[in-house]
């Protein structure tokens, strides 16, 4: 079953402390990691900046991305890959995700209070 992962992040002070050259080197490393993940069937659907004008917009983070992968195992490998890049050293980060379910199933769970 396909899994989807939404990442949310903002800069840490450690990111701001890097020189532009260091940031560029890190960005290149992230680009390579994204390519490796794509070859493993993990694909990005895109990256974005949080739209603060959106009704009830998430205020805790500045950026987001969404990923699609074939299984929970692929998701776990993805998260290990993110950690291996050093991403969490430079960004406050939270994840949201799981397999997509039908609206009917999730609404029924709400009715049951689950």
Q: Language-model features: where?
A:
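Short S/T/G/P-rich N-terminal loop/turn motif that feeds into the first structured element of a domain
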Residues: 1-61, 69-75, 99-114
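Secondary-structure boundary motif
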Residues: 39, 84-87
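Conserved, mostly hydrophobic/aromatic
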Residues: 65
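Conserved short beta-strand edge segments in small beta-sheet-based binding/regulatory domains
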Residues: 87-100
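Short amphipathic alpha-helices in soluble, non-transmembrane regions
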Residues: 76-85
């Amino acid at each position: 079953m396909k899994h989807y992962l939404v990442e949310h992040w903002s800069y840490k002070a450690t990111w701001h402390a890097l020189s532009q050259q260091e940031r560029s080197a890190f960005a290149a490393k992230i680009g390579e990691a994204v390519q490796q993940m794509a070859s493993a069937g993990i694909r990005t659907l895109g990256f974005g900046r949080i739209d603060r004008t959106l009704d009830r917009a998430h205020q805790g983070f500045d950026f987001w991305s969404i990923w699609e992968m074939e299984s929970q195992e692929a998701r776990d490998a993805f998260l290990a890959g993110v950690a291996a890049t050093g991403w969490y050293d430079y960004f406050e980060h939270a994840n949201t995700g799981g397999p997509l379910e039908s609206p009917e199933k999730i609404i029924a769970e709400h009715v049951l209070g689950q």
